[in-house]
Swiss-Prot record:
Keywords: Cell membrane, Membrane, Transmembrane, Transmembrane helix. To M.tuberculosis Rv2571c. It comes from the Bacteria. InterPro entries: Memb_transporter_dom. It comes from Corynebacterium glutamicum (strain ATCC 13032 / DSM 20300 / JCM 1318 / BCRC 11384 / CCUG 27702 / LMG 3730 / NBRC 12168 / NCIMB 10025 / NRRL B-2784 / 534). This is Uncharacterized protein Cgl2769/cg3067. The lineage of its organism: Bacteria, Bacillati, Actinomycetota, Actinomycetes, Mycobacteriales. GO terms for cellular component: plasma membrane. It is found in: Cell membrane. Its main location: membrane. It is a multi-pass membrane protein.
Amino acid sequence: MAKKKLGTVARLSELDKSLRNRLLRVRSRLLFIVHSAIGAGVAYWIAVEVIKHGQPFFAPMSAVIILGLSGGDRIKRATELTLGCALGVGLGDLLIMQIGTGYWQIFVVVGLALLVASFVSPAPLVSNQMAIGGILIATMFPPGDGGSIDRMIDAFIGGGVGILVIALLPSSPLDAGRHQVANVLGIAASVLEDVAASLKAKDAAKLNNALEALRRSQASVNKLETAASSGKEATTVSPFLWGDRARVRSLYRILAPVDNVIRNARVLARRAVVLTEDNDTVSDEQIHVIEEIADIALRLSDLYEHHKEISEALEIPELVNRLRQLGSEVGEDIAEDRVLSAQVILAQSRSIIVDLLQICGMSRESAVAVLVPTSESPAYPPELWDDED
C-alpha cells in the first residue's frame, strides 16, 4: 500500500503517535525482546546450574544491559561494559565486606572504583560501570558469604552471554536502516509538499508551523546513522550475515544523500518563508518542480518502507527518468527576473534532485551532469534528458 501524502506536522505526528507506527515499533523491537529474554534466562541458568551460585542477580542483569546497547561498535562497548560491571561488583563486594556500609564508605568505594577504572581502561563506560557496580553493592546488596568473587563471576557470565547472543543471534542488518531511510524521505516529501502548497497560497504561517515541527526530525536522522552502524557491525561479527555485506554497503552509501535531502529541504523551506513574508513569488514552473521532487521522495520512502526488490527494480528506473526530466527543466530561466529568494529555492531544488538521483544509485558526478548547466564551464559535461529518447 503506497504512502499517502501528508503535511509536515501530520507526518511527524504519525511517526510519533499513530497506531500503525506504534505496532511497527513493537515489531521492530521483537527480536531485541527475544534476545534479552533468552540472554537473561541463559545467564541465570549458567550461574545457578553450572557454576552453582545461589542468587546470581548480576548474571541476568548484565546480559540485559549488554543486549540493550545500540549503534556501532556494540562488541567493543559490550566488552567495556562487562569489564566495568564485573570489576565494580568485585571491588565493591571486597571493600564493603571489610569496611561496612555508610556515607563515607560510598565515598571510598566510588573513588577507588574510578581510580582503578582509569588505570585499567581509558573507556568512560568502564569507569561508569565500575562506579555503578560498587554503589549497588554498597547500598542494596550486603556482601556475599563467599567473598567478592561470586558476584563478579556472575557479572562476567551475563556479559559473556550477552556478547554471544549479539554475535550468534543477530538482528537483520537492513530492516531498521531501511525503515529510518523511509521515515526521513517521508518527512522531506511532506516538507516539500507544504512548500509547494504554501507558495501557491502565499501562506507563510503554514510554512512556519512546518518548520517548527521539522526541528524534531533530527532524531530520525540520528536513528538512521545508528541503524546503519549496527547493520555494518552485524555483518562483520556474525557469519550468518556475511551474505548481506553488499546490501549494507549500499545502505551506507546513501546515508549522506538522504541526510542532504532533509537538510536541503529545510533550507528551501526557510527561504520559502522569507519569500512569502516579503510578498514575492516564484514561477509556476518552480512550484511544479517542487511538487515533482516531493512526489518522487514519497515514492522512494514507500519503496524503502516495504523493501521489495522486485518493486525497486521496476520503479527506480522510472524515478530516475523523472528526475532526469526535471534536471533538464531547472535552468536559470524558470527563475529569471525573480528575487534572490526565488533563485535560492531554485538552487536548493537542483541540489535535492542530485541527492535523490544518488539515492537511486547514481554517482554524484553523473547526478550533477543531469542538471541543465548554469555555468559556461560546468565541472561535469551535461547529460540532459531528451524527450525523444
